[in-house]
Amino acid sequence: MSVSDFPLRIVQLSDIHCGEPTFQEEGMRSIVERVNRMQPDVIVVAGDLTAAGYEWEFEEVAVWLDKMEPPKVVIPGNHDSRNVGYIHFKRLFGDRFNRYRQAFDPERAERLAATGFTVVGADSSDPDLNEGHIGRERYPWIREQFSEDDDINIFALHHHLVSVPGTGRERNIITDAGDLLALLTRLDIDIVLSGHKHVPYFWGVNGILVCNSGTPTTKRLRGLTPPSWNEIHVDATTIKVFLHYADGRRELSVIRSRTTRAMIREAFYMTDDFLASNQVLAE
């Protein structure tokens, strides 16, 4: 069976927290084995690779991630920016703002109704702060990265763009969430990937599927939420999200219609007159 017969498959990990006292090495080993059997198109690691941003923590998590064979998009989280950890991140993983694109062969492009896919990862962390921020100075760069009109477009950041239920008082949503959401809506982004709260949850906002991932390898869990990570499938008509659990279960969690998404976008329209009269959106 050729790759053209498969949907676009994305593995979403976040909040690994290597160095954390409750870090589960066996859980990480299982993830490596399962991901390598799966062979997704890309792995997105949406921040908090480490517990406190120390060099040894980064080096340990880099060994684990190097064992995963597919291409990776890796961005830091707030824990990774502690103790000047962004220096170690850059040495081991490269730029904190990065892009990965893969073009589809003609058969797969026809099957998926897209020319390829683009993943843009952006660092939402500030050193030694739990709060997140992207910043309007980064918006032109983000806009430039999504340059293929017919791609499946995915944006990744660590901090959540939309509040996550069951996570207590909301204090860590990114500070420019409104401006960023407006930008991503205008760019016709299909999927937003984030982490931070250690709770998996999903929202549909302005036609965007927002996927928050849990922690797959620690016991820093809220309520009865088990460790988990996300597997995302995109085909011509749907986006499906499966949760993988530490006990080996794989559970279908979300089905999003791509056809309905297009209808929602067309049914919700802010007029040019309104936008011209109320120029508050960051460019």
Name each region found by the language model.
Residues 12-14, 43-48, 72-78, 123, ...:
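Active-site neighborhood of phospho(di)ester-bond hydrolases with catalytic His/Asp-centered motifs
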Residues 19-22, 51-56, 78-87, 127-130, ...:
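Active-site environment of divalent metal-dependent phosphoester hydrolases
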Residues 59-141, 183-185, 231:
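Extended active-site neighborhood of metal-dependent phosphoesterases/phosphodiesterases
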Residues 149-166:
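Short acidic, glycine-rich surface-loop motifs adjacent to enzyme active sites
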Residues 236-283:
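A short C-terminal boundary segment appended to hydrolase-like catalytic domains
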